[in-house]
Structure formats: C-alpha cells, structure tokens
Amino acid sequence: MALIPKEVFFVSGVGRHEDELVSFELALRDAGIERFNLVPVSSIVPPGCRVVSKEEGLRKLSPGQIVFCVMARYASNVEGREIFASVGAAFPEDKDMNGYIAEHSGEWYEGAEQHAKRLAEEMLKTQGSKVARTFAITARGKVKEFTTAVAAAVFVI
C-alpha cells in the first residue's frame, strides 16, 4: 500500500516549562498535534495533495495514530531571547508536479517567515516548476524557562 498523503494542514505552537521535553510537549499541545505519534519526513508535497484547515485535518486523525509531518523545532532556555520555528510551502502551477515544504528555525529576526517561503520556492524552481503560490506558518515566543517553538505541515493519508 502506497502511503501518499491526500491532504496537508499547517500548525504552530509554543510551550514553556522548566524541563525541555515538557516544553516540547506543551508546544505540540498548543499546536493541537500532541495526541499523535509524529514521524518526520522530508520536504515533498505530492501532486494533488489538498491543503485543508487545521480543524478539518484534525477531524480525520485519531489519538495514537502514526502521522507523518514536516516539522521545524527550536528550543532555548536563554531568558529574554526570542525564538521561532517556521515551515514554508511552495505549490506548482502544474498540478502533476510535486510541491515543497521547507523548515527554518532559530533566534527570531525580521523576515524569518519569508525566508521559509523562499526556501520552499527555491526548491520548487530547481525542478523547473513555476510557482503558483507560497505559504508559511510560524511559531514565535520570548524565552522564559525552557521554551520550544514548533511549526509543522501535517499529512493526512
């Protein structure tokens, strides 16, 4: 059986806790994807994969389900710093071609979210595709205790 995603949705979240692992769990909870066994995959959006809302995507998943995603994650405990995690997506004009998702994370700077979009767009262009549209989602937070930012493109098979 081929595991080709039919749909994708985008989420982001921030978590804070004295323990780094718990801050990650809280970031997943803030994003709404803490109830799944998340498996990281690389950057391909299959041809015909439809973008759906977070709410629609979550309705199609079950607690404990193995779920594939492209995730950006960044954690810090350096108080006062501002961190981020972004995923950017680029979709081709030609519906028979694949799109791309790019992860980008670190300490916040102006243009960070746009950089994630540009990365995905550049990967799409290198396959000779024209870009129909781009999208990005970002989690951003000021560090207090351990702080984790996550952004993810979550696939529905």
UniProtKB/Swiss-Prot annotation:
Keyword Lyase recorded: yes
Residues of the site described as Cleavage (non-hydrolytic): S42, S43
Lyase keyword on record: yes
Record-level Gene Ontology MF annotations: arginine decarboxylase activity
Domain of life: Archaea
Keyword set, alphabetical order: Decarboxylase, Lyase, Pyruvate
Note on cofactor: Binds 1 pyruvoyl group covalently per subunit.
Disulfide bonds: none
Residues bearing PTM Pyruvic acid (Ser): S43
UniProt catalytic activity: L-arginine + H(+) = agmatine + CO2
Enzyme Commission number(s) from the entry: 4.1.1.19
UniProt-listed GO biological process terms: arginine catabolic process
Requisite cofactors: pyruvate
Family: Belongs to the PdaD family.
Name assigned to this protein: Pyruvoyl-dependent arginine decarboxylase 2
